[in-house]
Amino acid sequence: MPEVIRAPRGTQLTCKSWQTEAAMRMLMNNLDPEVARDPANLIVYGGKGKAARNWDCFYKIVETLKKLENDETLLIQSGKPVAVWKTHEWAPRVLIANSNLVPKWATWEYFNELEVRGLIMYGQMTAGSWIYIGTQGILQGTYETFYAVAKKYFGGTLKGKLVLTAGLGEMGGAQPLAVTMNDGVVIAVEVDKRMIDRRIQTGYLDTWTDNLDEALRLAKEALKEGRPLSIGLLGNAAEVHPELVRRGIIPDVVTDQTAAHDPLNGYVPAGISFEEALKLRKENPEKYLEMVYDSVVKHIEAILEMQRQGAKVFEYGNNIRRLALDHGVKDAFNIPGYVPEYIRDLFSEGKGPFRWVALSGKPEDIYKTDQKVLELFGEDEHLRKWIDMAQKKVKWQGLPARICWLGQGQRAEMGLAMNEMVRKGELEAPIVIGRDHHDTGSVASPYRETEAMKDGSDAIADWPLLNAMLNVASGATWVSIHHGGGVGIGYSIHAGVVIVADGTELTRQKLERVLTNDVGMGVVRHADAGYEIAIQTAKKHGIRMPMMD
């Protein structure tokens, strides 16, 4: 059993600069037991999304970062440190490529063969790019999605409404709190009792039961009283959902965040106990997958029937529709995706999951940055509400962090403000600034972020590559290009960026460029596809697009 990994706190450097210290601490933070789903196996979240290929690679990365100079760049190939090159101080300290395969070979079957041979690693999105911050990292996006549902169909609130979902892993675990933040009631089905316990411990889930009747009783009481409540139901969605249909119980909203993007490692079939399923997964993966496919069909057919009976349903980006379609559910895509339905207008403005982490380890540093957000953007009541709720309801996992959806212009303004706070000594230590790959201009994913693009450009993967190259050119601290995050191998290409606000003048220049250009590529991507909000945002911020000048 490997040692317990936790990032160092405070102002004592163990590397040669804060730029490399930050990379080391964030790698370690991804494997903090408070943060990672299965740290002993280097798994952070999302099925088998890992921080490093194996423990030898992890320790060698740490060792290399401690020696890395300010004009050198470490290259990471699928979680393995492969080279250090002399570059320059404006270059990233780390460049990462995870899980990338030539398209013809981009299948789970081939990927798994390579992984068994020790040649590749699944990096998910923020697992292999060292900027995962725990479930908070997806919380505001989930909150924004359910708020958009409420705004579109229920007058702006989920009060008195029942939401049904499944999956309480590191991503799906945000759903219960996001629903109750919107004043709704949610039943979240989960097969793994450990995940339910983890959500209760971290404050994302109110209560749990292993009895459907009890879950419905609790939900009915809360709905009648108009109070928010989140209920974890220990069970299997492929059994619970059809039973609800059989009883004629149709929730107001239905979605799903099981890890169906990885059928072998992420989805547990019905008709077998959880413990037996884990055993079968190892001993007979072919039989296991047969059972998974049968369960996914039942799961999605039940959601489709709920949709026909009036429920507002959407897929939450786990590619379960495609899996169901491939196994006989011809109308699986009658279920809309959440991005075109609820998030695309935000992406067109450049808004997305901006995040920052206090390297000091002190919550006070995050609270001070929260106050800075309110000083700069306090006229936005929705944003004020988010910061207020986050302070009250989000428990720290690993290094204290904050997620805050900011748009074009706002991210650069906030980044520069935090750098100035570090320079003046208002914060104890530098701040790491990053984002999810699930952002406005950094993903090509036809079943999620780029589903149903206005111009039909869903599958064009040039955009995340341009995004990554631009961030390298702009002075980011580390940049990553991944494949298969969110929706699974073969279905997405995406890029990540991190920059460290250390209070220096050089970093001030880098921050202004990176945080303007990174999000600006999202505006450009959507403007190029014909979205009027993005076109107007580009004009407002003086973004030069030769074909639109």
Curated annotation (Swiss-Prot):
It catalyses: 4-imidazolone-5-propanoate = trans-urocanate + H2O. InterPro entries: Urocanase, Urocanase-like, Urocanase_C, Urocanase_central_sf, Urocanase_CS, Urocanase_N, Urocanase_Rossmann-like, Urocanase_sf. Its EC number is 4.2.1.49. It comes from the Bacteria. Belongs to the urocanase family. This is Urocanate hydratase. Its main location: cytoplasm. GO terms for molecular function: urocanate hydratase activity. The active site is at 404. Catalyzes the conversion of urocanate to 4-imidazolone-5-propionate. GO terms for cellular component: cytoplasm. Its cofactor is NAD(+). Signal peptide: none annotated. One of its GO terms (biological process) is L-histidine catabolic process to glutamate and formate. NAD(+) binds at residues 46-47, 124, 190, 236-237, 257-261, 267-268, 316, 486. Pathway: Amino-acid degradation; L-histidine degradation into L-glutamate; N-formimidoyl-L-glutamate from L-histidine: step 2/3. PANTHER family: UROCANATE HYDRATASE (PTHR12216:SF4). Binds 1 NAD(+) per subunit. Keywords: Cytoplasm, Histidine metabolism, Lyase, NAD. It is found in: Cytoplasm.
